[in-house]
Curated annotation (Swiss-Prot):
Compartments where located: Plastid, Chloroplast
Highest taxon of source: Eukaryota
Gene Ontology cellular component annotations, sorted alphabetically: chloroplast; ribosome; small ribosomal subunit
Protein name: Small ribosomal subunit protein uS12c
Species per Swiss-Prot/TrEMBL record: Chlamydomonas reinhardtii (Chlamydomonas smithii)
Family membership noted in the UniProt record: Belongs to the universal ribosomal protein uS12 family.
Outcome of mutating residue 91 to L: Streptomycin dependence
Keyword Repeat tagged: no
Alphabetized UniProt keyword annotations: Antibiotic resistance, Chloroplast, Plastid, Ribonucleoprotein, Ribosomal protein, RNA-binding, rRNA-binding
UniProt xrefs under NCBIfam families: rpsL_bact
GO molecular function terms listed in the Swiss-Prot or TrEMBL record: rRNA binding; structural constituent of ribosome
GO biological process, one term: response to antibiotic
Subunit and interaction comment: Part of the 30S ribosomal subunit.
Length: 133
């Protein structure tokens, strides 16, 4: 524990919290334009072709964002909404594209966790919830 004299000489330093998604500039989401849509392979124990997009945000940053869910309709010049959130097995991917907003369509035939994939209540889901009652 420092003495009062030591504290007078140099005050305690505040620990600054480093943001995990600096390109969003303290906003929950940002709009961006797809520059390139492609697939990448994950880190060592995993094996797949993960769909990602290079996006230029309205903040001026150019980031790599993950496209969640099965299948997508994204092409070059598509306008997308980007949120924070990394993908653990893809180095350098610190953002997710929000499904079901702007030019991004929701996941087809999705019944569970629909809100995360931009899917409205469909006849398939309505029948399932009616059957539970």
């Amino acid at each position: 524990m420092p003495t009062i004299q030591q504290l007078i000489r140099s005050a305690r330093k505040k620990i600054t919290k480093k943001t995990k998604s600096p390109a969003l500039k303290s906003c929950p989401q940002r709009r961006g334009i797809c520059l390139r849509v492609y697939t990448v392979t994950p880190k060592k124990p995993n094996s797949a072709l993960r769909k990602v997009a290079r996006v230029r945000l309205t903040t001026g940053f150019e980031v790599t964002a993950y496209i969640p869910g099965v299948g997508h309709n994204l092409q070059e010049h598509a306008v997308v909404l980007v949120r924070g959130g990394r993908v653990k097995d893809l180095p350098g991917v610190r953002y997710h594209i929000v499904r079901g907003s702007l030019d991004t369509a929701g996941v087809k035939n999705r019944v569970q966790s629909r809100s995360k994939y931009g899917v409205k209540m469909g006849s398939k889901t309505a029948a399932k919830t009616a059957g539970k009652k």
